[in-house]
């Protein structure tokens, strides 16, 4: 039979159980899973020119939750995957430095004097995604998927702490980026 990745079973099981009040979901991926594993995705992520990123700009917030992608890269691909993994430092560089360069944000993506100092301090051993939940917090009660993560100790934007242990500090040093 086809052997599928452990993460698929974990997603189907979820962590809300009977107490999620109908807010859970079942997601059945079919792309890049034809052989019952994610080896094709590993090959793509391993390519030296690959810049991993995923977003649809919020167009389908009631069906998918792409905001979990960076955490998935670090937990599944660097730490937990059974089989070939990817080095954490390569994934962080790809998500920070390589992505910033690709979109012309040359003052971000690495730590150096004079740069913005946008930093995530992560406890990689505690890093985990929680099961997606349906929330109704958009205008007119519109729904979207929310997926929380644990293990982010602090987030700094322009050197100021904006989140500590998942709680917003109230600091808003960010600014709108225009192309």
Q: Predicted segments — roles?
A:
Residues 1-85:
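Active-site neighborhoods of metal-dependent hydrolases
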Residues 1-7, 87-96, 111:
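Short, well-structured alpha-helical segments that form the helix of a local strand-helix-strand
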Residues 10-15, 81, 99, 103, ...:
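A generic secondary-structure signal for well-formed alpha-helical elements
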Residues 27-36, 41, 87-90, 100-134:
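Acidic, glycine-enriched loop/beta-strand segments at the rims
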Residues 43-50, 55, 121-175:
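C-terminal cap of metal-dependent C-N hydrolases
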Residues 67, 71-85, 92-94, 124-136, ...:
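Feature captures the catalytic cores and cofactor-binding loops of soluble hydro-lyases/lyases
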Residues 69-73, 170-173, 178:
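Cofactor-binding beta-sheet edge motifs in enzyme active sites
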Residues 94-98, 117-118, 156-158:
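Mid-to-C-terminal alpha-helical segments outside catalytic/metal-binding sites
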């Amino acid at each position: 039979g086809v052997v599928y990745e452990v993460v698929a079973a974990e997603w189907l099981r979820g962590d809300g159980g009977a107490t999620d009040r109908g807010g859970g979901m079942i997601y059945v991926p079919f792309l890049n899973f034809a052989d019952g594993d994610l080896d094709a995705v590993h090959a793509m992520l391993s390519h030296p020119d690959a810049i991993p990123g995923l977003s649809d700009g919020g167009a389908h917030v009631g069906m998918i939750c792409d905001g979990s992608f960076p955490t998935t890269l670090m937990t599944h691909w660097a730490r937990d995957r059974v089989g070939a993994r990817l080095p954490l430092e390569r994934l962080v560089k790809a998500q920070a430095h390589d992505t910033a360069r690709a979109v012309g944000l040359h003052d971000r993506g690495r730590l150096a004097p004079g740069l913005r100092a946008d930093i995530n301090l992560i406890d990689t051993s505690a890093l985990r995604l929680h099961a997606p939940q349906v929330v109704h917090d958009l205008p007119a009660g519109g729904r979207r998927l929310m997926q929380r993560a644990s293990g982010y100790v602090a987030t700094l934007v322009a050197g100021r702490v904006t989140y500590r242990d998942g709680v917003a500090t109230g600091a808003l040093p960010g600014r709108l980026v225009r192309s």
